[in-house]
Amino acid sequence: TMDFAFTAQQETLRREVRQFIAENLTDEIVEEMDIHGGADRPRGRGSDVSALFGKIRERGWLGIAYPKEYGGQGGDRVSQYIVEEEFHRAGIAITLGGSGAPAILAAGTEEQKQHYIPRLISGEITFCLGFTEPHAGADLASLRCSAVRDGEDFVINGQKMYTTAAHSATHIYLMARTDRDAKKHDGISIFIFPMDVPGITVRPLWTIQNNPTAPLGTTYGAARTNETFFDNVRVHESCLLGEENKGWRVGAMGLNLDRVGAWRYLISVSRDEDIVNWVKNNQFGDYSPAKNPAIRDKIAELWVEAQVCRLMTMRSMSIVERGDEFTYEGSAEKVWAPEHGVRITEAITQMLGPYATLLNGSPRAIDNGIFAHNVMGSFQSGINHGSVQVMRDQVARRGLGMPSSRKTTKEGAR
């Protein structure tokens, strides 16, 4: 049998987090977080946000599920989920998602674990992800960014796309080709190194969510990602994560573990709650959206889908918590949550019509343009951390034992 109830200790934690939010979180902080991002994006913030996250870190809430010997609390993933859920419902995201911490714990040396994990939890170190390239997106193993050994160093040359937070992160978690003669999945290595080493150039890449017409300080986050160039960047071999030429498995494992977490489910829930609150709290003359049977049916359907996503998240966390083999579950979660987000977007546009397209700064924008923000965000949610199409292929192969739908070749590896 499965027990879906939270423990008394977990419920106590939830009450503590709610009380903390009530006492410390302001509308101004939520707005600034919309601009600058989550807990792993510490730079570029005002003093109020910095003070808030200082208090969060003092309580150890960012590292609940990490081992005590590396600065965490040695707690369980469900408790970590509870903290993330309560903050997300209040309007801000706190997570170490995308930090590379799971991969470091699994594949790093003891020295790397001791150095990076406590500093990731404290916020002293933050990562950006250097995986995708202009010619290596869905087929990531076709990457061309090279790392050539020179004695005890590696010299890195190439380009990475969609390196979100590269302009603010202290370090990069980078995948590069270290053996051009090997099969394309075999000649890859993972490196972790500071972003201030010579030879790195970061250029902004603005997404659909950028809103240049909004009043200063009122645009929503996720508008900027980056393209990053590496020109004879020299790093020491100690920057290798895992073995040389064995980085594909490390990178894939890290991405899969990173897909386990509340954040993807909570994005869907927050969008559900946005539309539910609008429907319940608005009246247009004699017309009440909340009394429209078609709208009520659609909202109920979306709520059920959100609960399915929640259960998938909890199941994935339970598998990892027990130490069982974790193969396709993260990919399945990655398929369901973004597609649920798209269905929310479709419901928003059907209910609000042209008002769903009005951005913050428009005179008739609803709730500061949150719905337009959600609509635009849904387009990229199916691509981040692996496209939905690739995730389906992984579920078919790893979960159902079916053959791959794609051919594996060496093309693109050179």
Model feature map: region roles:
Residues 2-5, 95, 114, 118-284, ...:
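FAD-binding core of flavoproteins
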Residues 2-90, 94-95, 107-112, 119-124, ...:
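Alpha-helical interface subdomain recognition
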Residues 97-102:
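Short, conserved phosphate-binding/catalytic loop or strand-edge motifs used
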